[in-house]
Amino acid sequence: CPYDCGLCADHEQHSCLAIIEINDQCNLTCPVCFADSSPQRLENKSLAEVEAMLDAIVASEGEPDLVQISGGEPTIHPDIIAILQAAKRRPIRHIMLNTNGIRIAKDVEFAKQLATYAPDFEIYLQFDSFKPEALEHLRGKDLTDTRMKALEHLNMLNLSTTLVVTLQQGVNDDEIGKIIEFA
């Protein structure tokens, strides 16, 4: 709510999803990026700033249903593990990590660290297409092998994963059924 007296006179509104953006830096330069993230954007929120954001969500919600750690690309934040630990120490029912999957694909030990945050933890994995040309258009490079390797690691670790599609008419809209079946 917190007491804005908008839709609910009883102050019972709450956030079903809170998103914390921990950085602006990304290891991709996606043409479709709404966050204006890139490798040149070097800004990272400090651990103290992120903890203050987590505390504000908990103060507002009590026991938040879902907090998504996002960015930029949160897996390249130098304090990502400490940030996830800080989130797990709070009464948050479910934590989601929004990622393009590159680090998970390249670093199985990192993926193993992520798996220690289960069961109330999941990966929100960018997965737009099986077609290299569609990925080039949406993400600026063919990430087919990277996505498959990330999924291999996540499946090996039995880590809950949601595939997230940026859908663009005439680019990958013909694949939505195939992606749903694959998921």
Each model region followed by its residue ranges:
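Non-catalytic membrane-proximal stalk/linker segments that position and tether the catalytic domains
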Residues: 1-6
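Canonical Radical SAM [4Fe-4S] cluster-binding loop centered on the CxxxCxxC motif
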Residues: 7-48
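Radical SAM/AdoMet-radical enzyme domain recognition
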Residues: 51-69, 77-183
